[in-house]
Amino acid sequence: MPRLKLLHGFHAITARLRAFPATVNEVWYDPARQDARMRAFLHLAASANARLIAADASRLNALSGEKRHQGVVARVTEATRAHSLETLLDTIEGQPLLLALDGVTDPHNLGACLRVADGAGAHAVIAPRRRAAGLTAAAAKAANGAAETVPYLTVINLARALRALKNAGIQVIGTADDATTSLFDIQLDGALALVMGAEGAGMRRLTREACDEVVRIPLAGHVQSLNVSVASGICLFEAVRQRLKRL
């Protein structure tokens, strides 16, 4: 039986309407909002044959679990996604670019990581099934639409999954504050999986041991570490820069 979930906010729902319109079943909206953005949104939802339901602010708050829903909430069917590494890799054309997250439990950080992954053209974000943030409505809203465009694959054992990626010819590069090699001194223009640990805790030991190499982002100021989404963006776009330079 298909799983249902709720999304809220214009970006998350609009991205789903554009990417998987048939999965949007119902849309609750605030009729008090009659601006151009709401009109365009409702037109898009109606074009997808979603059922439109007028709802007041208290109803929208109850549905979304928060007040920052922008006046729109949608009930959607889970989109079909890759359920295994093998399936994921079979869908990728060209050199894979993957982001793996180890121990990232904050849904807002997950959403931000999905957003930078989308911006860099990454093919997927991978995380362990346990001790990791789920793809909740809060994560989807923070992703600003990227949760509907970037596959989020959860695996039982992240270290084992990384070894499988290596066996498939994908270079696995981890990041850590105590690494001696700089991110900017390593070749990243091939098939690549970048592994990010949680801020503070970093990668777990087995995850780190599964990496081909571990690098650091050189910091010139006084802070000791970066937010995981910021660090992910730096690493992903360095890989993109090297790929473009090679062309």
Curated annotation (Swiss-Prot):
Coiled-coil ranges per UniProt: none
Enzyme Commission code(s) on record: 2.1.1.185
GO molecular function, a single term: RNA binding
Keywords: Cytoplasm, Methyltransferase, rRNA processing, S-adenosyl-L-methionine, Transferase
SMART domains documented for this protein: SpoU_sub_bind
InterPro entries registered for this protein in UniProt: 23S_rRNA_MeTrfase_RlmB (IPR024915), Alpha/beta_knot_MTases (IPR029028), Ribosomal_eL30-like_sf (IPR029064), rRNA_MeTrfase_TrmH (IPR004441), SpoU_MeTrfase (IPR001537), SpoU_subst-bd (IPR013123), tRNA_m1G_MTases_N (IPR029026)
Cysteine pairings via disulfide bonds: none
Species name: Burkholderia sp
Catalytic function, reaction form: guanosine(2251) in 23S rRNA + S-adenosyl-L-methionine = 2'-O-methylguanosine(2251) in 23S rRNA + S-adenosyl-L-homocysteine + H(+)
GO CC term (a single one): cytosol
Assigned protein family: Belongs to the class IV-like SAM-binding methyltransferase superfamily. RNA methyltransferase TrmH family. RlmB subfamily.
Listed Gene3D superfamilies: 3.30.1330.30, 3.40.1280.10
Major localization listed first in the record, in broad terms: cytoplasm
Major enzyme class: transferase
Function: Specifically methylates the ribose of guanosine 2251 in 23S rRNA.
Gene name tied to this protein: rlmB
Subcellular location: Cytoplasm
Binding-site residues for S-adenosyl-L-methionine, renumbered to this chain: 197, 217, 226
Pfam families: SpoU_methylase, SpoU_sub_bind
Name this polypeptide is given: 23S rRNA (guanosine-2'-O-)-methyltransferase RlmB
